[in-house]
Regions:
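A short beta-strand motif characteristic of beta-propeller blades
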Residues: 2-7, 63-69, 109-118, 155-160, ...
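WD40/WD-repeat beta-propeller blade N-cap
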Residues: 7-12, 67-75, 116-124, 161-167, ...
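Hydrophobic beta-strand positions that form the internal "hydrophobic ladder"
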Residues: 28, 88, 137, 179, ...
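Conserved strand-to-loop turn within each blade of WD40 beta-propeller repeats
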Residues: 32-34, 41-43, 91-94, 140-143, ...
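Juxtamembrane amphipathic/hinge helix adjacent to a transmembrane helix
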Residues: 306-333
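C-terminal single-pass membrane-anchor helix
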Residues: 331-399
Length: 400
């Protein structure tokens, strides 16, 4: 079941996500559909894990590990990686949801089956997402049923069969208090994650369909971003989560959005379109900083996710497969640059204090006598007192 030295690739990419590892290392887990010829299955679906090289902004040429799904499971359709980086959940077309553990080191790893989930017999789950603190898992079904589970004890918090017509997208807030969900019929609802209580249904115009949702993650004033289609115009609505009222909107992409993501530090918002474009905007100004036109030429972008530690996007489509794109945005400060700046500020402060001390008439500097002139300040050695200065001070140098 596990192949540690790579495997032959099968069908197209259907889902995927980044895996955060220690020391800012990152892996990518990808689900691939079975390869078929007519009604015959030539090779079953697989789950693969690749390493990421930040120097070349590319994935490894062969997977670190591969898990082959049973033919009865069908194809993988959604994945969610726990924030701890050791577990992930995968939903399949026929076998429900399965829990996997990533075992091993940085070069030789295994994907191991874990204990059965309560979601194994609930049918295909279009959306899977862990809360930011890893304490909850939400699953949104093609049938419109919403489930929220505690993690890791898997206690069922909510099972709402009629949450939506069919769940399209979902996201937890940064504090893991709220869950936002969208439907294929254009509606969007807000749920309290602790007990599953429905809090609000987002207001929308008569010609407006809410497609996607993401909470802000910068830790300041929290917002909810929703990609919506207003007639023929795609917009991003912004909602205040204290009132759940819309406070503004912005057009950030030319065609209808198919997927949406917010960077881990909350600085950037990305949209992938149904014709293969990618737009990245700064959240603070809502201005576009990066635009990749026809990144997946003529194909709807199915997967869009920011790398946890780099300004890099992972995208995929049915025809063009997975792509890793480095963003053309302003560079972030590196750790060594911050330390160098702090050291420079400290040295400037020390020099300023020294100059102030040498030129001050304070308790720590003996008061100037009558007719006494202030000594010259030397930065590179002790200056010798003049004869006039010695005569004006009969006590000589004073030591405290």
């Amino acid at each position: 079941m596990e192949i540690e030295d790579g495997s032959t690739r099968t069908g197209h990419v259907t889902c995927g996500s980044w895996i955060r590892r220690p020391e800012k290392a990152n892996w990518v887990v990808l689900g691939r559909a079975a390869r078929r010829r007519g009604s015959s299955v030539l090779s079953p679906g697989v789950i693969e894990i690749f390493s990421f090289d930040p120097r070349t902004s590319s994935l490894s040429s062969s997977p670190l590990a591969t898990h082959t799904l049973e033919e009865s499971d069908g194809d993988p359709i959604a994945t969610a990686v726990h924030p701890g980086g050791d577990d992930f959940v995968c939903s399949t077309t026929k076998g429900g949801c399965k829990l996997f553990e990533v075992c091993g080191g940085e070069t030789v790893i295994k994907i191991s089956d874990q204990k059965p989930l309560p979601l194994e017999v609930v049918g295909p789950q279009k959306c899977l997402v862990f809360s930011f603190d890893g304490s909850k898992l939400a699953a949104g079904g093609v049938d419109g049923c919403l489930r929220i589970l505690e993690w890791p004890n898997l206690r069922l918090i909510l099972e709402e069969p009629k949450a939506h017509k069919s769940i399209k997208d979902m996201d937890f807030s940064l504090d893991s208090e709220f869950l936002a969900t969208t439907s294929t019929d254009g509606s969007a609802r807000i749920w309290k994650a602790e007990d599953g209580f429905p809090l609000a249904t987002l207001a929308r115009n008569s010609d407006e369909n809410i497609e996607l949702c993401r909470f802000s993650k910068d830790g300041t004033k929290p917002f909810l971003f929703c990609a919506a289609q207003r007639g023929d115009t795609p917009v991003v609505n912004v909602y205040d989560i204290s009132t759940w009222k819309k406070i503004g909107f912005k057009k950030l992409i030319r065609k209808a959005a198919s997927t949406m993501a917010v960077s881990l530090d909350g600085k950037y918002l990305a949209l992938g379109s149904k014709d293969g474009d990618v737009s990245v905007a700064e959240v603070k100004t809502m201005e576009i900083y990066h635009y990749s036109k026809r990144l997946h030429l003529g194909q709807s972008i199915a997967l869009l996710e920011f790398c946890p530690s780099e300004r890099v996007l992972l995208t995929s489509s049915t025809q063009w497969g997975e792509m890793v794109t480095r963003l053309s945005v302003p560079s972030d400060w590196k750790d060594w640059q911050i330390y160098l700046l702090l050291l420079g500020l400290f040295m400037v402060s020390a020099i300023a204090c020294y100059i102030f001390f040498k030129n001050s008439d304070s308790f720590w500097n003996f008061p100037l006598g009558k007719g006494q002139t202030r000594p010259k300040v030397s930065f590179f050695g002790d200056s010798k007192p003049s004869d006039d200065q010695s005569k004006g001070n009969p006590f000589g140098p004073v030591e405290l």
